[in-house]
């Protein structure tokens, strides 16, 4: 089962994935955790270019293409060979929709066209953790273990457009996207997600 987790900066995805992995392993499921951009050696190198806050000259189209390239490598190396497992993936195609199609105003048609390969492997289930961008960025700033990246440094209006994009996407693909209020405690969000996963496994 291929499960993805989406949300703006500071939405708690990484923490939740670790908690879910621990529980699913205890229940004897074969679990793989991974992330985008990244997840494999080559894809992680692309990630470092994308998120390096010194690379301010990256254009919107280049950014979108790099995300798509990282995703293709990740699919071939990690996702497709492990589709018989429970895959918990931190971000996937919906991040490109929210950040590039809406946040960068590139539009859904362009983003879908460069991600046509990934569209053949859509998640079985996606959890979108909805959170006000200011709350999320404040959380990121308070987390000293988090290194501020290029996307964290974007202005508030960009992050607001990303959130609006996620809401639109959730309406477009409601058959696979579960929207969760990110203002709840991590434990409450975890329980909602776990209940949804166990219903489908």
Swiss-Prot record:
Class of the enzyme per the UniProt entry, highest EC level: transferase
Sorted UniProt keywords: ATP-binding, Kinase, Nucleotide biosynthesis, Nucleotide-binding, Transferase
Classification via PROSITE patterns: THYMIDYLATE_KINASE (PS01331)
Annotated Gene3D superfamilies: P-loop containing nucleotide triphosphate hydrolases
Example of a GO cellular component annotation carried by this entry: cytosol
CDD domains, alphabetized: TMPK
Name of protein: Thymidylate kinase
Annotated organism of origin: Acholeplasma laidlawii (strain PG-8A)
Species classification: Bacteria, Bacillati, Mycoplasmatota, Mollicutes, Acholeplasmatales
Gene name per UniProt: tmk
